[in-house]
Amino acid sequence: FNLYPFQEKVLKLFQKHDYSIINKSRQLGISTLVSAYSLWLMLFNKDKNVLVIATKQDTAKNMVTKVRFAYQNLPTWLKIGTSEDNRLSLRLANGSQIKAVSAAGDAGRSEALSLLVFDEAAFIDNIEEIWLSAQSTLSTGGNAIILSTPNGVGNWFHKMWVDGESGTNGFNTIKLHWTVHPERNQEWRDEQTRILGVKGAAQECDCDFIGSGDNVIDPQLLMWYKETYIMDPVEKRGFDGNLWIWEHPNYN
C-alpha cells in the first residue's frame, strides 16, 4: 500500500531502533504498518519469530489477519509458501512465523523472539509482568514495538513513555498526534469531540495522557499547570540518575 510521509518516517524508525514505543491517535494505519513490517521481517529472513500480545485474543488476531491478507496479495514471485495457517498464527516455508496471544498467564514466555508487539499496551492490566517475562526471550537480539492510545497516567505504558523520553530505558518514542494525517483538519477533530466527548477525544486523538485518565480535577487545568510550572531538570546525577537538579546552588 502507498504510505503517507509520517508512515514512511515511522517505518524508518522501526529499522533504526531496536525498541520503539508509539503514543498514537486512532485510525492512522499504524497497526497495518506494523503488520506490513512484520511480514517483511518474516519474508526476507529465515526462522524469525513474531509475537503479538493484546488485551484480548481477537485484538491480537487482527494483526495476524492483516499479515495474512498482505501475504495473499503479494505477487506470485514473492510468495514462498506456508507451512501453517490458522486464525492465530501464520508460518512461512522458511520457518518464520507470527503468533497472536491474549495478555494472560505465560503470554510473554516463548521461544526466542525476533519481534514482540504490544497492541493497545495502555489497556493491558498485567503488562508489566508480561514484559519482565519477555526479557529473556528478547535477550538474543529481539526487537519490540509498543503501540497504544493513552489511558491516563501512572500505568506501565505511561511510565515507559516517560522513561523513553528521558532516554533511560532504551525505547525510541514516537508521538503521532492526529494532525500528522494529511487528510484531517480541525473540522474532523471537532466531530470526534462531538462523537466521543472531551475525554474520549483526548484519548483517541490528542495523545493526551492527562486528559485521557479518570481525573477529579479538570484535565485542561492540569495541562495548564504542567505547561506553566513543570520543567525538566538541568541535570541528573547519581548511579541511577535519580538525583534531579533544577537549579545549581549559588555559592557567592
What residues fall within each predicted segment?
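Phosphate/NTP-binding elements of NTP-utilizing enzymes
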Residues: F1-N252
